Regions:
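Acidic/His metal-coordination segments adjacent to aromatic residues that form catalytic metal sites
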Residues: 7-23
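Active-site core of glycosidic bond-cleaving carbohydrate-active enzymes
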Residues: 19-46, 52, 56-59, 70-166
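Short amphipathic coiled-coil heptad-repeat segments
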Residues: 64-69
């Protein structure tokens, strides 16, 4: 897009919730893919210029993600899922899973807040009733990745008892 994020007309929720013309998840996953391509290229002895280009593109995308998606949403300095989005979404955890930790503290607070967290895990979107186990697991992974081990372990301990064992 002109803003430097990845354009996409859908996301992993396949139209069940709004995703805009560019969404946080797709851009974050592409960022991670660029870093992975750079590392793989080095392992495969690809030209240094090629792997450096992937790293530069990833760095530019990381900055674009912050500019385009970084926002105050429902009182948290976290990410909006797409331009114009004003509700917390579970997938604000995805940047954390790929090493984008600029807004990690507030994002973790938002994920574990009553706006998103329920007895069944994370709501897909605040104010809705839909929850998705995959989003909950990614949120736990992202929170662990940014060092929020104590709080995350407390929330993780509920998961097997509630969702796996009933």
């Amino acid at each position: 897009t002109p803003d430097g994020v990845v354009a996409s007309d859908s996301d992993e929720l396949e139209g069940r919730f709004p995703a805009g013309d560019a969404n946080l998840c797709t851009s974050s996953l592409y960022y991670d893919a660029l870093l992975s391509a750079s590392m793989l290229g080095r392992e495969l002895h690809k030209p240094a210029a090629q792997t450096a280009a992937y790293r530069r593109e990833a760095a530019a995308l990381r900055e674009a993600i912050e500019r385009h998606f970084g926002a105050r949403v429902e009182g948290f300095d976290t990410y909006r899922y797409y331009e114009g989005n004003d509700r917390l979404r579970a997938w604000i955890c995805i940047p954390l899973t790929v090493g984008i930790d600029t807004r990690s503290e507030e994002t973790v607070r938002a994920l574990f807040s009553p706006a998103l967290w329920t007895e069944n895990g994370l709501l897909t979107q605040s104010g809705d009733k839909t929850f998705w186990d995959r989003a909950t697991l990614y949120a736990l992974r992202g929170a662990y990745a940014c060092g929020e081990t104590g709080k995350t372990t407390d929330y993780r301990s509920f998961y097997p008892a509630r969702r796996l064992l009933g």
